[in-house]
Amino acid sequence: MTETPNTSSEEIQTSEPSPDNELQVLQQENANLKAELQEQNDRYLMALAEAENSRKRLQKERTEMMQYAVENTLMDFLPPIESMEKALGFASQASEEVKNWAIGFQMILQQFKQIFEEKGVVEYSSKGELFNPYLHEAVEIEETTTIPEETILEEFTKGYKIGDRPIRVAKVKVAKLPAKGNSDSNEEKE
């Protein structure tokens, strides 16, 4: 069996792609590679964004933890500072020697207050203000008709806050109007 020249050229023509077919194949490969490149680029950008978000979240958590630690430490100093303030309140009634000691303790107390101020801790006054459950804890209620209801009559423990956020609420006595049933029963007894 011998091959004829026509047969072999036909085989060659069918095995070699035409330039148009080759161009289409290359264009398709190019499109596929571009799509794959775009997909890889999108994945890279997504991973980069996730890493940046994680970094920001960790930084925020770290800052919050540091703030919480500072707050807790400062809170631990409040009772001794308040005790020192109360003790210094009686110094004016003491001897000259005790008054001299009190001056030194007053200076130390000022240093503590300055540290609190530098850390953003401020004391807030409550007496005469309206009761706010976010800033106050009512530990006592007094019925009265002479003062508007929910007015703070007395402050037992000072409140402190950092910015607008309380770190310790003030413990207070709050005014309340007498119940109508109580005033009627008191009138009947008379």
Curated annotation (Swiss-Prot):
Could you tell me which residues belong to the region Disordered? 1-21
Feature: compositional bias, Polar residues = 1-18
In the record, what terms sit under GO molecular function? adenyl-nucleotide exchange factor activity; protein homodimerization activity; protein-folding chaperone binding; unfolded protein binding
Question: Where is it mostly found?
Answer: cytoplasm
Q: Name one Pfam family in it.
A: GrpE
- Provide the protein's localization: Cytoplasm
UniProt keyword Electron transport, yes or no:
no
HAMAP family linked to this entry: GrpE
The task this protein performs is described as: Participates actively in the response to hyperosmotic and heat shock by preventing the aggregation of stress-denatured proteins, in association with DnaK and GrpE. It is the nucleotide exchange factor for DnaK and may function as a thermosensor. Unfolded proteins bind initially to DnaJ; upon interaction with the DnaJ-bound protein, DnaK hydrolyzes its bound ATP, resulting in the formation of a stable complex. GrpE releases ADP from DnaK; ATP binding to DnaK triggers the release of the substrate protein, thus completing the reaction cycle.
Q: What is this protein called?
A: Protein GrpE
Organism in which the protein naturally occurs = Chlamydia trachomatis serovar A (strain ATCC VR-571B / DSM 19440 / HAR-13)
Q: Which gene encodes it?
A: grpE
